[in-house]
Each structure stands twice: as structure tokens, then as C-alpha cells.
Amino acid sequence: MRIDVVSIFPEYLAPLELSLIGKARQDGLLELNVHDLRTFTTDKHRTVDDTPYGGGAGMVMKPEPWAQALESVAAARENSKPVLIVPSPAGEKFNQALAYELAEEEQLVFACGRYEGIDERVIDWAQDHFRVRPVSLGDYVLNGGEVAVLAMVEAIGRLLPGVVGNPESLVEESHSDGLLEYPVYTKPSAWRDHDVPPILLSGNHGKIAQWRRHEQFRRTAERRPDLMEGLDAGVLSRADRQALADLGYDVVDGRLRAKPGGDTEN
């Protein structure tokens, strides 16, 4: 996969040289290029922003530097239409499913906005050259797109074949199956009056798997009850359904629903 990031603060992306993403770059599993938007300006001050039409606070990023930068990036892959991801609180919400989807692409381009955002005409113009997807990390506002890009590139990059040493790690972690991950423990088994759950010391792998599954249900119901209704009840075993019933959930029309008047553990 090739990833291009355009930013006025290219040094902000330095963490992508570290850890698994950095190693993936060194091993040739991921080609990642960071471009300074200011190199695509034409004035001596390297200006990338101007006042907004219609008035209002703040500045808006000028369209021409962005067009020049994006044309340069798009030219790297002829006869293709890369995905252009624009981090924005007005975009679709980034989640694990979207990370998996984007990990299948050959090239991703990230446009890191600043100030009050990028001139909207850039987004309109880019539709002819890219598959444009404004994407949001969540319902909050950041100073710029770089932090969001760091998170998205790591979430996407670690899904590429060979990046994570043990592929099973990807299957068992939070959100891979719509649930939060079960709690994990290591040695010593007794620590400061807190013991590891006995089932994990039993050596009974079937019961351990069931315990972990039920802990996923419990943790998700407590911390992210919004995820529960998105589960496909068709894949639930009888033991799963009983565990969910104990947490206050019934299966209605193939989906989980909190029992009317019942108490879920959240």
C-alpha cells in the first residue's frame, strides 16, 4: 500500500517512523510519503490561508496550493483514482470496519486541514481525481487533521499483511467482532490483594474461551451499550444468549435489545 499525507506541519507525522508502522516502512510493506503543502505555494511568504468570504472568525486554506499538491500525489499512480481522506468533524465516523475497508486500497491520500478548514471547492474539484471521503474520529474538534491522520494510519496500517507479527491478535482485539476485548492478565497470579480469575489458571481452554466471550459481552454492555444493538444475533450460541439474558438483553427480530424495564449492567 502507498499512503501520502499532505500537511503544513510534516514534522507532526514523525511518529509514523516508529514502532510497527515504522518497521513496516523499512520492510517495504508500506510506502508512506509526507508532503509539505507550503512547497506548492508560489509567493515568497508561502501563504496557504486567507480570510473567509462572507466574514467570520479564522482563516480558510487556499484552494490552489491544495490542487497543486493533490495533482502531484495523484500523478504517482496513473490510471487509478486513489481514495482522498479529509479529516473533518463533518465527516463519516472512523471505526474498525472502515479501517478494514481502507486497508484493501492500493493508495490512500490524507489531506490535513488547519484553521477553519480547506476551501470547499477543493473537495468538489477533487471528486474528478479521487474518491473523496471526509472522515471524523469522533464528535469533537482538533486543531488540525494531523492527529486524526496519525490514528487512522496506524489503525489501517496494522491491518496490512505482515505488519502485526501474530495475525490472531487482530481477530481477538476490541471492535474486530463488534465487541470490546476481554480483560487480560499476566504474572504474578496474585498481586496486591488482586488475583487473576481462577478460570484462566485452570488449563481448560474451552471454558477459558467461554469466559472471555462472556467478559466481552459484560464489558461492552457496561462501557459501550450502543454497540450491543449492532450485534448479529444469528451467530450467537445458546451459551451466548444465556449470558446476554443475564445482562438484561433479549433477541428481537435478529437483534439484541435491552429488556423493557430491565436493568442492563451499564
Curated annotation (Swiss-Prot):
Catalytic activity annotation: guanosine(37) in tRNA + S-adenosyl-L-methionine = N(1)-methylguanosine(37) in tRNA + S-adenosyl-L-homocysteine + H(+)
Class of this enzyme: transferase
Keyword field: Cytoplasm, Methyltransferase, S-adenosyl-L-methionine, Transferase, tRNA processing
UniProt subcellular location: Cytoplasm
Alphabetized Gene3D superfamilies for the sequence: 3.40.1280.10, tRNA(m1g37)methyltransferase, domain 2 (1.10.1270.20)
Domain of life: Bacteria
Entry GO MF terms: tRNA (guanine(37)-N1)-methyltransferase activity
Residues annotated as binding S-adenosyl-L-methionine: G113, L137, G138, D139, Y140, V141, L142
UniProt KW RNA-binding keyword: no
GO biological process: tRNA N1-guanine methylation
EC number: 2.1.1.228
InterPro entries linked to this entry: Alpha/beta_knot_MTases, tRNA_m1G_MeTrfase_C_sf, tRNA_m1G_MeTrfase_TrmD, tRNA_m1G_MTases_N, tRNA_MeTrfase_TRMD/TRM10
One of the record's GO cellular component terms: cytosol
Protein function: Specifically methylates guanosine-37 in various tRNAs.
NCBIfam families hit by this protein: PRK00026.1, trmD
Similarity remark: Belongs to the RNA methyltransferase TrmD family.
Subunit-structure text: Homodimer.
Official protein name in the record: tRNA (guanine-N(1)-)-methyltransferase
Species annotation: Paenarthrobacter aurescens (strain TC1)
